[in-house]
């Protein structure tokens, strides 16, 4: 019996962190950015917004002729702080205000995941949630962090795998979800589509 050919995998995101996590898990997707305007969507809750954005991004890329037959992964993350959905801050002033509001508190990082199987025209989607407990950086530390430019490029104005890591006391839930993609969630969604994640592994170098 011959092995089935490995399915083509496409990541509908320009996030280097998401791509890196998938590669660490043995997956090597192509990157095709959706270009979807996130301001076009609204939702009653941050979790629903994250899911709607993930589904929209996956569906936009899945509709492209060049990806037919592929599995397309779309993700989007927002921070739920007091029921408000916080994505990437618009500017340094907003990033500073966010950090002053977040310090010493906890928020929930919501990441929507959608996997679209362009071969079967089916999709599976879910939101993963991780509680993030923020430390209490000083005003000077916040100013230095904002000046680094990093918080302007990430949902919630922070990331676990960057310069804000010392300002995060801990998390409750999936570490990868906070970085941008929950690998256990990806595995479950692939399973719903009848695809085993091990079938997508790239061969190990000898």
From Swiss-Prot:
Keywords: Cytoplasm, Hydrolase, Nucleotide metabolism. This is Nucleoside triphosphate pyrophosphatase. The keyword Transmembrane does not apply. InterPro entries: ITPase-like_fam, Maf-like. It comes from the Bacteria. Belongs to the Maf family. Nucleoside triphosphate pyrophosphatase. May have a dual role in cell division arrest and in preventing the incorporation of modified nucleotides into cellular nucleic acids. Its EC number is 3.6.1.9. Its main location: cytoplasm. GO terms for molecular function: nucleoside triphosphate diphosphatase activity.
């Amino acid at each position: 019996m011959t092995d089935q050919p490995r399915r083509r995998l496409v990541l509908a995101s320009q996030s280097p962190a998401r791509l890196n996590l998938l590669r660490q898990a043995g997956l090597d997707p192509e990157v095709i950015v959706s270009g979807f305007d996130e301001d076009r969507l609204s939702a009653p809750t941050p979790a629903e917004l994250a899911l709607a954005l993930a589904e929209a991004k996956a569906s936009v890329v899945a509709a492209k002729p060049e990806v037919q037959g592929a599995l397309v992964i779309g993700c989007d993350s927002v921070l739920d702080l007091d029921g408000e959905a916080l994505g990437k801050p618009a500017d340094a002033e907003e990033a500073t205000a966010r950090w002053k509001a977040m310090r010493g508190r906890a928020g929930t990082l919501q990441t929507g995941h959608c996997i679209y199987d362009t071969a079967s025209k089916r999709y599976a989607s879910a939101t993963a949630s991780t509680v993030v407990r923020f430390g209490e950086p000083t005003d000077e530390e916040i100013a230095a962090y904002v000046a680094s430019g990093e918080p302007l490029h990430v949902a919630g104005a922070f990331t676990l795998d960057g310069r804000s890591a010392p300002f995060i006391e801990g998390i409750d839930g999936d570490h990868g979800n906070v970085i941008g993609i929950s690998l256990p969630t990806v595995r479950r969604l692939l399973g719903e589509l009848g695809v085993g994640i091990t079938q997508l592994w790239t061969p190990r170098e000898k």
